Amino acid sequence: MRHRNSIRLALLIAVVSTIGCDRVTKHVATMVLAGGEVHSYLADTVRLEYVENTGGFLGLGADLPDAWRTTLFTAINGVVLLVMAVEALRFRWRGWLLTGVCLVLAGGASNWVDRVARGTVVDFMNLGVGPLRTGVFNVADVAIMLGVAALALSGFRSTHNASPSDQEPGHPA
């Protein structure tokens, strides 16, 4: 039980740190970049620009009516995040599975806070070479993508060496 509580504390610190980093960088981006000027670095490989994203990932759903967007990106997303948090505490996940869930949860929660507080999500980073560029994103999006990669790695590894204890229901907190 003591080991389990240590893991929970470490995960809480990781989630709070990820959210904190995202919140701080979004605040700085708002203060420095909101004027509309694009800052380019490393031969235009890295661009910093302020964007208020009303949609989801890469702006998907931005053209939906306001009521649909609010329901989809705030209410439903909030429920999904809550379920993820409960499941993360309930199951004895380990390794890449636990890492992935926590990163997705942290990034999703930070973007959800933006959406609830502002109605939009602040994005400010863009990477690329020449005409090949990413969409504009933020630290929370990076956490989500790293989390998805960790979940994929966990799924790949579990098909090769299944460990039933990775998903045993845990004891109540």
Residue ranges and their predicted role:
Residues M1-A173:
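Alpha-helical transmembrane bundles and membrane-interface segments of multipass inner-membrane proteins
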